[in-house]
Amino acid sequence: MKKLKRYILICLGLILSLQSYGSKSLFTTHVTITTYNAVRSQCDRSPLITADGTKIDNRKVKSGEQKIVAISRDLLYAIPLGSLIYVEGHGYYEVRDTMNSRFKHRIDILQHSSKKNFKKNNIKIKLVKKPPIKKKNKNRKK
């Protein structure tokens, strides 16, 4: 009887792990979301360039072609720059920027300056895709 119980528990564990592996989200958490504009007063000296070097095109931001978020630094361990996340109620965004270190457990959605800024608490976000790992070329000449 003990062997049967152990076998059932092992099978249940495998089923649960396979179900979570098969889901599309790699990491899920609840955060505060805010919005920002690509202007000097809300960014650094180069507001049209993100932390990973992506150039912001305000026309694409306004039309929704370029959907970028900045992420608080405490979340970078699980959601690295270049990742694709799903923000519940808002859609898919690329993580291209980082926030000031004083902010914790927060994401900042880039939006055009013509839209009204907002803040929402306890919004679910899901990591959908991590960026590809860049391999170092060992045969590169110096």
Give short role names for the model-derived ranges.
Residues 12-21:
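Hydrophobic h-region of N-terminal signal peptides that target proteins for export
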Residues 3-11:
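Sec-dependent signal peptide recognition
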Residues 21-142:
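Solvent-exposed, well-ordered loop and adjacent helix/strand elements within mature globular domains
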